Amino acid sequence: MPASLALVDHVEVRPSGPSCFDDVPFVEVVVYRSDVVGSLLRPAYLKEARDQFAAGKLSDAAFKKIEDRAIDECIDLQILAGMEVITDGEVRRYAFYGHLIDAVEGFDKYGGWAIPFHDEKGEQLVLARPVVVSKLRRKRPLCAEEFTYVRARTKHPAKTTMISAQQAAAYYDSKKSAGAYATVDAYLADLVDILRDEVSELIRLGCTYIQIDSPQYTALLDPELREGYRQRGNDPDRLLDLSIEMDNAVIGDHPGITFGLHLCRGNNQSKFYAAGDYGPITKVFRNTKFHRFLLEYDDERSGGFEPLRQVPVDRTVVLGLVSSKKPALESKDELKKRIEAASAFVALERLALSPQCGFASTVEGNAVTVADQEAKLRLVAETAQEVWGKSVPLAHSA
């Protein structure tokens, strides 16, 4: 392996093909047909409590009770909507990556690369990302509390969402981070260790479905964002192979555990940062070890289904056809037509359905109401039930 890719020496990036890991079991324990990407809208009372807690006006115990109440409501919402697998709504986080920043010492929360998000009307907002400024040190588990709380509240299948090493590569800046890590590789090596340990801990606690969130893969499609990587000491062409290697190292080999990879193009208050079809990054489908790919496909920004030809025959594609950014409710008949169109490239039995992304990747949430969110989750569940029936248990080869 070239020295530039020697971040984790036990993972080999293999050639493409129908399945580039033919000696590794890639059979899901259950093929869930209706899936939720992760985040749900935070209720107003939780946002107010978060502000009070930050101002020192609310105790840890009082704030935790309020978070718990919001999670209980998220659980009930998803189960009543008919979703086959649920999350805690990510309501304990200030953003989808907040579990990393709050649990690991070494980041300046808002001191990093400011990414412009925009919408079809040209309206923009800027999100200031974290930046690593000192050596990483894990203060507490990243996701364990989230999972164990849901596990204790319901017997319904639940998954946990985690940031990818690839996503967190954007938190390195060759100027601001140099005092902590001379190279991005040194930073990422520590990060991979932390994320890999968290995966092992989640599995020890009984989690059987772990989703890795990696919207930065699609950033590699955008010329402006690629240049942003270069300016911060990160070669975007090298980063694709390195990211695949890192994400494979994080999830490791755990028979009986389902791993999903979510790809989107940014999701912040109904705005996005990138566009383009999946064609240039289909290596992610072929060379990673994920069982499920949760892909944004709600509008023309995502391109057509043709790149799905590159998905190995033993993986599941979760089609994100229902927008979490816009309030208008999609037509069930139109969803079924799009599922049929996708089945020309991936067999119907290897497809599933979800919203295109979370409803609140940041604490502010998207421009949809709680009623919109519920209707869209119900639409996903009902459409999946009508197309596929109930989720299918499969034998898992160990």
Annotate the PLM regions.
Residues 3, 25-398:
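Domain-level signal for soluble alpha/beta catalytic cores
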Residues 2-10:
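Extreme N-terminal basic, low-complexity initiation segments
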